[in-house]
Curated annotation (Swiss-Prot):
PANTHER family: OVARIAN-SPECIFIC SERINE/THREONINE-PROTEIN KINASE LOK-RELATED (PTHR44167), SERINE_THREONINE-PROTEIN KINASE CHK2 (PTHR44167:SF24). Probable serine/threonine protein kinase involved in the G1-S transition. Disulfide bonds: none annotated. GO terms for cellular component: cytoplasm; nucleus. SMART domains: S_TKc. It comes from Saccharomyces cerevisiae (strain ATCC 204508 / S288c) (Baker's yeast). This is Serine/threonine-protein kinase VHS1.
Length: 461
């Protein structure tokens, strides 16, 4: 891994590399003007669209090294201070399908911008364009849900905390669906956490605006990918698991719902039920399609939780419960496991439920909806923490503070599959005048981008 010590991109000083994927690198950076931390994702300027996130580690590493070398050359030739233009975010947000044919790597950014106003979706602050890559400046958060579940055992002793985090994820995803965007890669690595255990959805690299997706089109990460996207022949093995012949397309939103079911198992049981929802490759999943009760044999599920999962993990996507129904049932459920701390979980009051699922932060009317931007700041975190009934608040904090970092209740372990990805989209204008403005903005942006590429072509060789 190449370290870019004392290297700057405009006013952002790179302090460390915190992630890598098939099409980009993620750095932690300090804004030297405000002394605030950000995450900067460096995305290669053009790549073939790969819909499956599970690219081999060797290929991911090879692509990362290639980009690192280009960045090293860029920093060297600019004496460690790269000055690049900031692209108008509104222009990117309103890019069309035709625009993406010219600049395919902007699809992910555009979709993300359309929903990043939700309080539980990572904010994009700037998009910077160089001849080597596009830099996306976003919120920085100290950890992700995978680390919190597996390494810190953070949720298995506190049912209220499970509800809080899961409902925030559902709220963010529901907001995306309402805006015609389907994430298609919901997994713990794409869910970040602040110091107050608020969760933030990120990485829209595989997202689509297509309401329906054809069966057997692999989009997502294997552990969380619904069966209809892996291997589907138009038949379902058992009527118990909701089986009947599917049509030629499957609802995109219901694929995200399946992923949420696996996430909820992760939060409560610290494991995945199977490695892949493919009858030919995974025996556990095969037996599940024959008899869904197998879940109660391999996981410590309460009857109520099993009943809920049976409505989510329907093999036929058209038979899955709605996201709104899922949110309501999670709010009212009184047990997740058949023993231990999660065997008794109080239902949420209406006010607390609404606070968790609200798309904006209503804890302080003087603060903007996205005041979560600086939640890594402990003072800001205290000012922005939610309020609830004393009993519920004490219940959440008790599970965080009382175990001094030592948490019990593990029933297995999750396997990691990380990566950065790529994407889809479309848009429309409400008037000819609006379309003209967007077209003019994009033309100027495209011209500037081409000038940058031509003047610095040696950097990409």
């Amino acid at each position: 891994m190449m370290m870019f010590h004392n290297c700057r991109i405009n006013n952002y000083l790179i302090t460390s590399q915190i992630g890598e994927g098939a099409y980009g690198l993620v750095y932690r950076a300090l804004d030297i003007r405000t002394d605030r931390q950000y995450a900067i994702k460096a995305v290669v300027q053009s790549y073939g669209v790969s819909k499956e996130a599970d690219m081999g580690n060797d290929k991911i590493h090879k692509n990362s090294v290639k980009l690192q070398k280009k960045l090293a050359k860029l920093f060297k030739e600019s004496k460690n201070v790269v000055r690049v233009p900031s692209i108008d975010l509104e222009s990117i947000e309103n890019m069309s399908e035709e625009d993406f044919k010219k600049l395919p790597h902007y699809k992910e950014i555009s979709l993300h911008l359309r929903v990043h106003h939700h309080k539980n979706i990572v904010t994009i602050h700037e998009v910077l364009q160089s001849a080597v890559c596009t830099f996306i400046v976003m919120d920085y958060y100290p950890t992700d849900l995978f680390t919190s579940i597996v390494d810190n055992r953070h949720f298995v002793t506190n049912g209220l905390l499970v509800k809080k985090v899961f409902l925030q994820i559902c709220s963010a995803l529901n907001y995306c669906h309402e805006h015609g965007i389907y994430h298609c890669d919901i997994k713990p690595e794409n869910l970040l956490l602040d110091t107050e255990d608020n969760v933030f959805l990120c990485d829209f690299g595989l997202s689509t605006t297509s309401t329906y997706i054809k069966p057997n089109v692999c989009i997502g990460s294997s552990y969380y990918m619904p069966p209809e996207r892996i291997s589907f022949d138009g038949r379902v093995s058992s009527s118990k698991s909701g089986g009947h012949k599917l049509g030629k397309v499957c609802p995109s939103c219901n694929g995200d719902l399946w992923s949420l079911g696996i996430i909820l198992i992760n939060l409560t049981c610290i494991r995945n039920p199977w490695l892949k929802a493919d009858k030919t490759e995974d025996n556990t999943y095969y037996y599940f399609t024959k008899d869904p009760n197998i879940l109660k044999q391999i996981l410590p599920l309460s009857d109520d939780f099993y009943s809920l999962l049976s409505k989510i993990l329907q093999v036929n996507p058209k038979n899955r419960m709605s996201l709104q129904e899922l949110m309501k049932e999670v709010s009212s459920i009184t047990s997740f496991t058949n023993e231990g701390p999660l065997s008794k979980v109080p239902p949420l009051s209406k006010s607390v439920y609404e606070k968790f699922v609200s798309p904006v932060d209503n804890t302080n009317e003087n603060l903007s909806p996205k005041s979560y931007v600086y939640m890594h700041d402990s003072k800001a975190a205290k000012n922005l923490s939610y309020t609830s009934s004393s009993e519920e608040e004490d219940g959440i904090k008790e599970g965080i503070d009382d175990d001094n970092g030592s948490r019990s209740g593990s029933f297995g372990t999750l396997d990691t599959d990380t990566g950065l990805h790529s994407s889809f989209t479309s848009t429309s204008c409400e008037s000819d005048n609006e379309c003209s403005k967007i077209s003019n903005k994009f033309s100027l942006f495209e011209k500037k981008f081409n000038e940058l590429r031509m003047s610095s072509s040696s950097l990409t060789n």
